[in-house]
Amino acid sequence: MGFRLLCCVAFCLLGAGPVDSGVTQTPKHLITATGQRVTLRCSPRSGDLSVYWYQQSLDQGLQFLIHYYNGEERAKGNILERFSAQQFPDLHSELNLSSLELGDSALYFCASSV
């Protein structure tokens, strides 16, 4: 019985082009098997206190997941219970995706602002 592969691709929302946004998202690309857990990390540009996470599945628009400001959750969108996020004292944020399913294949974006 083969493993079905799940493709979770992570790109930086503002850093995809030649302009240096200062936002760093890692990993940039990720392929993993269903059932696994992955962590996506976002380091905002210097001075930015807000971090936003978005998901874009195939043939769908950008879906807001969650917003943090200065370490506190400020707004929650359509985020699955299997997904969680947090913002740390140094203001970087992590999006944790657990028990991955084929339907979780998407682009995951982070953005930051003052």
Swiss-Prot record:
Secretion signal, residue range per the UniProt entry: 1-21
Organism ancestry: Eukaryota, Metazoa, Chordata, Craniata, Vertebrata
InterPro entries linked: Ig-like_dom, Ig-like_dom_sf, Ig-like_fold, Ig_V-set, TCR_beta_variable
Residue ranges constituting the Ig-like domain according to the UniProt record: 22-114
Gene name per UniProt: TRBV9
Gene3D superfamilies named among the record's database cross-references: Immunoglobulins
Gene source species: Homo sapiens
Keyword hit for Transmembrane helix: no
GO biological process: adaptive immune response; cell surface receptor signaling pathway
UniProt name for this protein: T cell receptor beta variable 9
Pfam family, one: V-set
Function of the molecule: V region of the variable domain of T cell receptor (TR) beta chain that participates in the antigen recognition. Alpha-beta T cell receptors are antigen specific receptors which are essential to the immune response and are present on the cell surface of T lymphocytes. Recognize peptide-major histocompatibility (MH) (pMH) complexes that are displayed by antigen presenting cells (APC), a prerequisite for efficient T cell adaptive immunity against pathogens.
Glycosylation sites: N96
Paired cysteines (S-S): C42-C110
Oligomeric form and interacting partners: Alpha-beta TR is a heterodimer composed of an alpha and beta chain; disulfide-linked. The alpha-beta TR is associated with the transmembrane signaling CD3 coreceptor proteins to form the TR-CD3 (TcR or TCR). The assembly of alpha-beta TR heterodimers with CD3 occurs in the endoplasmic reticulum where a single alpha-beta TR heterodimer associates with one CD3D-CD3E heterodimer, one CD3G-CD3E heterodimer and one CD247 homodimer forming a stable octameric structure. CD3D-CD3E and CD3G-CD3E heterodimers preferentially associate with TR alpha and TR beta chains, respectively.
The keyword Disulfide bond is assigned to this record: yes
Location within or outside the cell: Cell membrane
GO cellular component: plasma membrane; T cell receptor complex
Keywords, alphabetical: Adaptive immunity, Cell membrane, Disulfide bond, Glycoprotein, Immunity, Immunoglobulin domain, Membrane, Receptor, Signal, T cell receptor
